[in-house]
Curated annotation (Swiss-Prot):
May be involved in mRNA splicing. One of its GO terms (biological process) is RNA splicing. This is Protein saf4. The keyword Ribonucleoprotein does not apply. Belongs to the CWC16 family. It is found in: Nucleus.
Length: 299
């Protein structure tokens, strides 16, 4: 008699797929070979800390395999990958962290020659190398002599040189204090609690672009003189009428005619002019034009 569920087909993506995948992974006990800084939590993982790492082969150096150890930080669960380096016989942190440099690591490194150049293989190459070195030494000698002569010329009289430097420092200090006062007044006016950096060329270009854009949007507003519109004179109304005919008429061809009231007519008779044209009327957030004439004969 067959048992329960015997002979039943279970697909690879079934409920046992995860358990099968876990069996394929090579999980080992890995010990950190050196101190490592975590890039996520900025904490240090000390040397000798042990982890459950996934070991897998990622390449080879000649016939030596290169292994990768994937682990997670014990403080923030940040994934860290450590690879073997067969060429230099050490480990490297590939991602997720960085190695902490210690003094003993510097002392253990092999010393390198100051002029780590390849040895010439023949006499012609050796001669070319010698000529190049002589040319370089001659150039360096001329530069050193120039610097020495310049220092001797500038500091031939220490008192005059010191006086000149103090004068430059005083002028620079005055400029800095003046700029600091300007920045402080700006911070007080704008209620800022940040440091104001000196302006740059890019800031100036951006400000000009913003200004041009803003002036372009408000072109018809800039033409209007608000001080003159507030003055109770006929010249004000005539100026605004001329502006309204050239500006608002183009934008609103279906402007409504406005019939002035009796009170407005009585006020307009006080003006010394004969013709009054144009007045802006705002009703329900809309702009309407006025184009009418009032003569002295009307009663």
């Amino acid at each position: 008699m067959q048992g329960f569920n015997m002979g039943k087909y279970i697909p690879p993506e079934g409920p046992n797929a995860k358990r099968k995948f876990d069996k394929l992974r090579n999980v080992i006990r890995f010990e950190m070979p050196f101190p490592v800084w975590c890039n996520n939590c900025e904490n240090i993982i000390q040397q000798g800390t042990r982890f459950n790492a996934v070991k897998k082969e990622i390449g080879s150096y000649y016939t030596t395999k290169i292994w990768s150890f994937s682990l997670k930080c014990h403080l923030c669960s940040n994934p860290i990958d450590v690879h073997t380096d067969p060429k230099n016989t050490e480990y490297i942190v590939a991602s997720g962290g960085r190695r902490k440099i210690e003094p003993q690591d510097i002392n253990e490194r092999p010393a390198k020659a100051e002029n780590d150049e390849k040895v010439p293989s023949d006499a012609i190459e050796a001669l070319e190398t010698q000529l190049t070195q002589q040319k370089s030494e001659k150039h360096n000698s001329s530069v050193i002599n120039f610097i020495y002569e310049k220092n001797e010329r500038l500091w031939s009289d220490p008192f005059v040189s010191s006086q000149r430097l103090r004068k430059q420092f005083r002028e620079r200090k005055k400029i800095e204090k003046k700029q600091e006062a300007k920045d402080l007044s700006l911070k007080n006016r704008a209620a800022l609690d940040i440091d104001i950096l000196p302006p740059s060329s890019s800031d100036k270009d951006k400000a000009l672009l913003l200004l041009d854009n803003e002036l372009g949007k408000n072109k018809f507003i800039r033409k209007l003189d608000y001080r003159r519109t507030l003055m109770p004179s006929s010249r004000t109304f005539s100026t605004f009428a001329k502006f309204a005919e050239t500006s608002f008429a183009k934008k609103d061809p279906f402007a409504r005619k406005f019939v002035p009231s009796e009170k407005l007519r009585s006020e307009q008779r006080k003006f010394p002019t004969e013709n009054l044209k144009g007045e802006k009327i705002l009703e329900d957030n809309s702009v309407s034009l006025v184009n009418y004439e009032v003569s002295d004969d009307e009663g």
